[in-house]
Amino acid sequence: MAIAVAGPEIERLIQLLARLPGLGPRSARRAALHLIKKRDALMTPLASALQVAIDKIEVCKTCGNIDTQNPCTVCTDPRRDPSIIVVVADVADLWALERASATNGRYHVLGATLSPLDGVGPDDLTIDALVARAHDPAVGEIILALNATVDGQTTAHYVTDLLQDANVKVTRLAHGVPVGGELDYLDEGTLSAAMRQRTLF
């Protein structure tokens, strides 16, 4: 018979932390103990930051990014190129592209990729809003920045079919050898994609 070693409040904290990606029950217990030990330095500021996030952060009605203003700072930045829309699966992908300064265009967050096995269909994504944006005369290119997975490629093909009537160029990210990568460590699919998408040097 298991013996309760913590009160219900602490158990609730552990249960909630265990719902975070990458945290199982054991890691959640360690995180909870760390927060409790660092109450003034970490737990109180974290609770405050979470409350601010609850009160102020919202989803951009234009692109699906999260921000403290709506439309978001990316959509309202006059230095951005309004003719380019970069399509990503989720906000984490948008942030990755921004960290890399990979584009000066604007974004569209689908919310996920099509995944029949997980029960994610077209109605679960913001594809209709993307198609509507693609028909804006100011938009000239849609860049599909989706993962090179089966679900990512399925989504890319589905979106491309829906954009055939829009007067836009549809491109996707190149797939292949990563910077600093060694050929011997790459899988066959990556090597094949890199060979097909080779460029002049």
UniProtKB/Swiss-Prot annotation:
Domain Toprim: 83-178
UniProt zinc finger (C4-type) residues: 60-75
Family as reported in the entry's similarity comment: Belongs to the RecR family.
Record-linked Gene3D superfamilies: 3.40.1360.10, 6.10.250.240, RecR Domain 1 (1.10.8.420)
SUPFAM superfamilies: Recombination protein RecR
Organism name: Rhodopseudomonas palustris (strain HaA2)
Residue ranges that the Swiss-Prot or TrEMBL entry lists as coiled coil: none
Task performed by this protein: May play a role in DNA repair. It seems to be involved in an RecBC-independent recombinational process of DNA repair. It may act with RecF and RecO.
Gene Ontology terms for molecular function: DNA binding; zinc ion binding
GO terms of biological process kind: DNA recombination; DNA repair
InterPro entries per the UniProt record, alphabetical: DNA_Rcmb_RecR (IPR000093), Rcmb_RecR (IPR023627), Rcmb_RecR_Znf (IPR015967), TOPRIM_dom (IPR006171), TOPRIM_RecR (IPR034137)
Pfam families tied to this protein: RecR_C, RecR_HhH, Toprim_4
KW DNA repair (keyword) present: yes
Origin superkingdom: Bacteria
UniProt keyword ATP-binding, yes or no: no
UniProt name for this protein: Recombination protein RecR
